[in-house]
């Protein structure tokens, strides 16, 4: 810069002008040729810098289009779409929410808009659509949640009610079992002792065999007694009728019922059982026993009655046997070798 020239910028003024002070070479003061010049700012970048907007040195066509569109979107320069354009764009969005380049160009040509405007409208519309979709999904999920929560609360109430019922029933059952056990303990139950009805039935059953045996023996005795009476009542010349007590046959310590025949032979059980028993006549001198022919009548006090012809055969042996066993009969008092016989 040449000496004597000064440049002042008037940034505070809204016109953006500059002042030049030119001092002459020969001037020594203000009156010596100093001059002031006022002019506009020649640099475009400085004018834009006053607005605070920085423009890059190299720009692409897309960046220029975007800058122009956003400049149009400013509040003072925003262009509103007509209802016909909005309706056509909405219908196109319902058909397909994705915007292809060919479709974007065609829509811009039909609507008389810039392709960039159509693209931005579709982008904003998709965002609103997604927001609405999320809101609908949220409302649906919230309704489902509320329904499930109500069902859960109802199930909890039912669960508490059933639990209370179970507890009350359990308490009643325990009380019933306690009452039953108390009543059962009051009644004395001895497992080892039979019931009263069983005792009444069991006692006759225990005595029944003995009673039957006694009845059978009594019947047999009665039958043999009848047979003996029949035979005694129908005897021949030397026979006699004796009392009922004479029908008891005593031998070897055991009593037996025997039917006596009118002949010499008399009825006795097996010989093995009466091997110690003998038959023989007993007179008055020896045993104090008299026969029917001695006194003319039958005596019940004697032990044996023998005919004279049959008594001869056993006289000696019977008398000897009687004295031999007399002492033994007195000691035990049980064995008596006496027999009855009729002819």
UniProtKB/Swiss-Prot annotation:
SMART domains: HOX. Residues 74-133 bind DNA. InterPro entries: HD, HDZip_class_I_plant, Homeobox_CS, Homeodomain-like_sf, HTH_motif, Leu_zip_homeo. GO terms for molecular function: DNA-binding transcription factor activity, RNA polymerase II-specific; sequence-specific DNA binding. It is found in: Nucleus. Residues 218-239 are annotated as: Disordered. Keywords: DNA-binding, Homeobox, Nucleus, Transcription, Transcription regulation. CDD domains: homeodomain. Residues 132-176 are annotated as: Leucine-zipper. PANTHER family: HOMEOBOX-LEUCINE ZIPPER PROTEIN, HOMEOBOX-LEUCINE ZIPPER PROTEIN HAT5. Probable transcription factor. This is Homeobox-leucine zipper protein HOX16. It comes from Oryza sativa subsp. japonica.
């Amino acid at each position: 810069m040449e000496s004597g020239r000064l440049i002042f910028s008037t940034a505070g003024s809204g016109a953006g002008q500059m002042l030049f002070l030119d001092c002459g070479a020969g001037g020594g003061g203000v009156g010596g040729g100093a001059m002031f010049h006022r002019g506009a700012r020649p640099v475009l970048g400085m004018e834009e810098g006053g607005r605070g907007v920085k423009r890059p040195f190299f720009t692409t066509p897309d960046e220029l289009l975007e800058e122009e569109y956003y400049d149009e979107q400013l509040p003072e320069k925003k262009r509103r779409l007509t209802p016909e354009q909005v309706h056509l764009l909405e219908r196109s969005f319902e058909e397909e929410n994705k915007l292809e380049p060919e479709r974007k160009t065609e829509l811009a040509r039909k609507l008389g808009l810039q392709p960039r405007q159509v693209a931005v409208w579709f982008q904003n519309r998709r965002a609103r659509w997604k927001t609405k979709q999320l809101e609908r999904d949220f409302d649906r999920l919230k309704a489902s949640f509320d329904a499930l929560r109500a069902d859960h609360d109802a199930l909890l109430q039912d669960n508490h009610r059933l639990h209370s019922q179970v507890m009350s029933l359990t308490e009643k059952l325990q009380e019933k079992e306690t009452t039953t056990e108390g009543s059962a303990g009051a009644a004395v139950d001895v497992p080892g002792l039979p019931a009263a009805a069983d005792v009444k039935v069991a006692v006759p059953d225990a005595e029944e065999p003995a009673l039957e045996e006694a009845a059978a023996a009594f019947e047999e005795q009665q039958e043999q007694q009848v047979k003996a009476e029949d035979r005694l009542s129908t005897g021949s010349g030397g026979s006699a009728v004796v009392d009922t007590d004479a029908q008891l046959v005593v031998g070897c310590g055991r009593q037996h019922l025997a039917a006596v025949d009118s002949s010499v032979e008399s009825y006795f059980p097996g010989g093995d059982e009466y091997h110690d028993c003998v038959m023989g006549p007993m007179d008055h001198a020896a045993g104090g026993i008299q026969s029917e022919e001695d006194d003319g009548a039958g005596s019940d006090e004697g032990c044996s009655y023998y005919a004279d012809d049959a008594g001869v055969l056993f006289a000696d042996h019977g008398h000897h046997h009687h004295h031999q066993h007399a002492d033994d009969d007195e000691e035990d008092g049980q064995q008596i070798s006496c027999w009855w016989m009729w002819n």
